[in-house]
Amino acid sequence: MRLTRLIKFETRIVVARVSEEIRKATIYLNPEFAKRCGIKEGDVVAVSRGNRGLRFRVKLLETAPEDGGIIPNSIFSNFLADFESFKSFRADIELSEGDESTEEDVIRIIMQRK
């Protein structure tokens, strides 16, 4: 077990418009930020904001924000964002186990809250 599995890091998330990955829960992290957090490409991370959280598969991207990452505009980014911060927001990120969240997972969470 990696020690970083026990640590949360605050990060800035930017919601991007275009991506082929829009149907998958993918987060693009800056390689230096990922290294500082002990996160590697292909890892699954939990991204949480308030009482909302999802799991994302990590890809590294040099042009991602230095202090965080990019989530393609999708059901996943919309679930974490709100009207005041739908393009950029702060969130916690930590290593997670299991697979990335699916569209069905998001729909199930929303329906359970009603």
Segments from the language model and where they lie:
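Long, contiguous, secondary-structure-rich segments that constitute the structural scaffold
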Residues: M1-L29, F33-K114
